[in-house]
Amino acid sequence: MHKLGMRNLLLLPLTLALAACAVGPDYRAPVLPESAALVRAESELVTAEAVERDFWRGFDDPLLTELVEEAFDANHDLRIALARHDRSLALLRQSRRDLAPSVTAQAGAAHQRVSSDQMPQATRSQRDYESYDAGIAALWELDFFGRVRRAVEAQQAEAEASAADLRAMQVVVVGELVEQYVRLRGLQEQLRVAQANADNQRESLALVDARLEAGRGTEFDSVRARAQLESTLARIPALEGEIAAITHRLAVLTGREPGALIARLEKPTPMPALHDQVAVGLPGELLRRRPDIAAAERRLHAATASIGVATADLYPRFTLNGLLGTQAASTGDLFGRDSETRLVALGVDWSFLDSGRVRARMAAADADAEANLARYEQTVLQALEEAETALARYTQSLREREHLEAAAEASAEAARQARVRFAVGVVDFLEVIDAERSRLEAEDGLAQSNVRAATALVGLYRALAGGWEERMEAPRQATAEPALSST
C-alpha cells in the first residue's frame, strides 16, 4: 500500500507536467507595412530589383574590397558584438538545461567523537564514530505553468536579437569604412586640384614678374599674384592633415595601429565610380532586411515572454527531489546491500500570500513589453525615413555634381583664356586672378560634390541594409537547437 501511494504521488505531477500549458500571452509578430515603392524612388535612378550583395564591389576598387574583408576579420567592434552574441547563446544553453533535472554526485566521510560527559560509561573507542556516504541527487522543477519554458523563450529571443545586433554592427562598420575611404579619395583629389592650381598660379606669378622686369607690369599685379598663390598653398596643409586622420581611422577600422595603412593608401587613385542606377528593392523587403528592426522585434518577443515568467509566479511551483546512494560506518560496508539509501520527495512553493509583489512584477513586465512595442514601431518608421532621406540626398547630389562638372569645365576654359588675353595685353591681371580663383573654387567644389555623391550612395546602401546578406549567415545561430513550443 505504501509503494502504491508513493507511485501515485509521483505519477500525479508527471501527468500534470504532460498536460501543462504556459501562462502569459503567446507572442505574435507585428505586421510590417507593405508599400509599393519608396516615395523618392525616381525611375531613371533606381530600380525595384533586389538590393545587390557586397555593394562595395560595385565601386570596382580592389583596395577597397580588401579593406572591407580585413574589417570583417579583425574589426574590434565586430569582435565585441560577436562575443556578446556568444554570451547570449551560452545563456540560452543554460536556460534550456533548466527544462531537465539537475543531477549532482556527492560523497562524504566524517569522523565524530562524542563527549565523555554524554557517554560516561563508554571507552574512547566506543565514543568514536565514522560515517561514509556516496550518492546521486536530482532536482527537477515540474514546469506545470510554463515559467521555465517562457524563460527559455525569452532567452532565445534575446539570443536572436544579439545576432541581429551583430549584423547591425557589420552594417555600421562596413558603411563607415567605405564612407571614410571615399572621403580619403575625395580629399586626395582636392589636394591634387589645389596643387595643380598652385602650379598654374606660379606660372602666372612668373609671367607678372617678367612683365614687371620688362617695364610692362606693375608691382600691384605682382603682389596680388603672390597673395593668391599663398592663399592656395594655405589649403594644402589642412587637406594633408585630414588625409592623415582618415588614413589612421581606416587602419583602426581594420583592426590595425593607426599608421599601418599609410603605405597602401598614400598613392592617390580615382574616386570610386558611381552607379547609373541603384537597386533599392521594395519597402517591405527593406523592413525585413534591416537588422535593427529584427533586433527590436526579437526584443519585443523576449519582453512578451517575460510577462509569462512573471505570471507563472501566481501559481504554485512544484519540484521533484530524488536521492539514490549508500551510507555506512566503514568503507568496506559502503557498497553493501544493507547500506543503500533513497529519497523521493515532492515539494510545493506557492507565494499566494505575496501576490501583491507578483502582480507588481507582472505590471512591470507588461509595461516593458509596451515600451518594446513602441520602440519596434519607432525603428520601423526610422528605417523608412532613413531610406527615403538617403535616396533624396543621393538624387540631389547627382544633380549637383552634373552642374558642378559643367561649371568646372567652363571655369577652366575661362582661366585659360584670361591668361592668354593678359599675355597679349588685352586685359589686366585682375581678370586672371578672378578667373583662376573661380577655377579653383569650381574644381574644388566638384571634388567635394563627388565625395558627397559617393557618401550619399553609401548612406543609401546603409539605409537599405544592402550588401550584407551573405555575411549575416556567418554568426552563430540562436536556433541551432529546436525552438521550444509553448502550448
Per-range role (PLM):
Residues T218-F220, V426-A447:
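Short terminal targeting/anchoring segments
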Residues V68, D133-A137, Y181, P283, ...:
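Membrane-embedded beta-strand positions in outer-membrane beta-barrel channels/transporters
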Residues R79-I80, R96-R97, L142-Q170, F220, ...:
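Sec/SRP-type N-terminal targeting helices
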Residues L212-R216, F422-V426, A463-G467:
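A short glycine-centered flexible hinge/capping loop motif at secondary-structure junctions
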Residues H2-P13, L18-D73, Y132, Q156, ...:
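Terminal intrinsically disordered/low-complexity segments used for targeting and assembly
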Residues A22-E176, R317-G322, T341-L343, S355-M362:
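Short flexible linkers and secondary-structure junctions
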Residues V148, A163-L282, R393, S397, ...:
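Periplasmic alpha-helical coiled-coil/stalk elements that build and connect Gram-negative outer-membrane
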